[in-house]
Amino acid sequence: MVGISELSKEVAKKANTTQKVARTVIKSFLDEIVSQANGGQKINLAGFGIFERRTQGPRKARNPQTKKVIEVPSKKKFVFRASSKIKYQQ
């Protein structure tokens, strides 16, 4: 798994800048994606994928210990759908 420090190191090399600047740009970019998705927007990055916030409706679930059926309330999920360009890339 690659963390933000490894990612910022590689971005800094390719952008010919410092790792600190690269880390700030990456964090700002990710914060803005989350902010826009939370505001109800779909973020479409051509050739990469779509980020969005979706509502999962309420559902029934079973407690495995008591076997009792419970109602699970609806919740908002953060979803990413990969572009076919990267989904099937080798």
UniProtKB/Swiss-Prot annotation:
InterPro entries for the chain: Hist_DNA-bd, Histone-like_DNA-bd_CS, IHF-like_DNA-bd_dom_sf
One Gene Ontology term of the molecular function aspect: structural constituent of chromatin
One GO location term (cellular component): cytosol
The organism's place on the tree of life at top rank: Archaea
GO biological process annotation, one example: chromosome condensation
A family per Pfam: Bac_DNA_binding
Keyword set, alphabetical order: DNA condensation, DNA-binding
Subunit structure: Homotetramer.
Biological role: Histone-like DNA-binding protein which is capable of wrapping DNA to stabilize it, and thus to prevent its denaturation under extreme environmental conditions.
PANTHER family, per database record: DNA-BINDING PROTEIN HU (PTHR33175), DNA-BINDING PROTEIN HU-BETA (PTHR33175:SF3)
Family to which this protein belongs: Belongs to the bacterial histone-like protein family.
Protein's recorded name: DNA-binding protein HTa
